[in-house]
């Protein structure tokens, strides 16, 4: 067997365990409930609007151009629909495949960065699939997972391979361009710092400094040309307002004086611990990080050149969201895998001490089990005042058993501790998602409301939404006409007078008896309520008058017996 075929055999053997495990758990989890608002339903709404109106160049939502994101994710959804028909199965399978691609690429990058330490490459995918934050966001139809694929591809093109020291600049340009088409210029924040700091971690960059920077600039320009191949026709097709929103508001508005998601500079610091869970509670990982000594290997320098500037730059941006760091999670996984590997290689007390084992994670699992077991007793004693915990109480006991078993599993002696932590984290995170689906399903299921609205649309009735509409009904109801944005006061009165058969969607924080009596449909919606009204009834109530009695009773979801309806006064 040649060296190349042996390497391929070892690579395929490494996939044997973690890849099927990830695919199995992720596919089960992602189909536990329909696409949930707001991220998944909004992405599907854009894809559906483009599809139904045959507008594949410019993303649209609710009949208007959507400048928040570039179109590549929507095109991938359309590719599946072209073969399988319009459905919500393919977009979810696509997200799982994107997650699997991240695992495979992360392992390949770890192998390139640390060719002399095979254990780092073997453990990297286990650490990446174990990151609870990344797994949960990978279950949503979002752009950051796809962006992470292109970021990993770009890094693989920069890092020297076993048979080629120079970067693959054409591949680097293509990955940058695909990143642009996924989420716009923010792709540069993820890849440019590592390229700029190339001479610090790459021998070829030190020896060929001028070529490194010249060809890197050419590759970035090439990626920009890929973006321009879409942007220029899109601008010509959609006009000046879309141009301004796409080129200035979409990216620049998040960088300086953000119009949404404005946070302080330090906001990401506590999120580091959330992003790296469960390993943040594994003492051996911390021991490995603190044991790293200079001079750092080239692979570690590359990871720091990727992670640290990205953290500083995103912290400097005015607009912040936790999932902006999803493309950095593979780098964090490789860094933690390397730290644990080097600690293991050096030997000594820290490499095998039980005090640095998984016991904090086991205690956390036992604590979660105890809470889930206690919820029904607290509920019966009238001690639960939070409706989220109240809804968990009726379905939490089986999950308490699960977390009890996972805690015991983490305390088992023997080898394979890292894989044990990873497997327990993956199953535990999927269990938490299943608990979420069972307990809070009605607050995130848009299908009943979407069917009611679609029926009204089919009859030619207008539909209005009080406040910002994020497309949460568009795909589930296969709706083809825009929903009007409404405002309280005279605007609502005028709209109701103009559309006597129209429906109005409102999102009150609290319900009252009139809502249960006169509304068409009521259901929990995320942390508030969603109420669908006949427009004249709502307008009459807003004037302080009593509307006429409806011939049909109010639809109360998930059921009229739902405990929160009994507390309405």
Model-inferred region functions:
Residues 2-7, 11, 170, 174, ...:
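Membrane-embedded architecture of ER/inner-membrane glycosylation machinery
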Residues 71-75, 84-104, 141:
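Loop-to-helix entry region of an early transmembrane alpha helix in multi-pass inner-membrane enzymes
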Residues 32-58, 64-76, 86-89, 239-240, ...:
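Extracytoplasmic catalytic/substrate-binding loops of multi-pass membrane glycan-assembly enzymes
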Residues 93-116, 153:
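Transmembrane-helix motifs of polytopic, lipid-linked glycan transferases
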Residues 45-48, 136, 182, 187-322, ...:
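Transmembrane-lumen/periplasm boundary regions of multi-pass, lipid-linked membrane glycan transferases
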Residues 111-114, 154-169, 179, 340-343:
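Membrane-interface transmembrane helices that cradle and orient dolichyl/undecaprenyl
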Residues 136-147:
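Short acidic/glycine- and proline-prone juxtamembrane loop motifs at membrane-interface regions
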Residues 11-18, 106-130:
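Transmembrane-helix signature of polytopic, membrane-embedded enzymes
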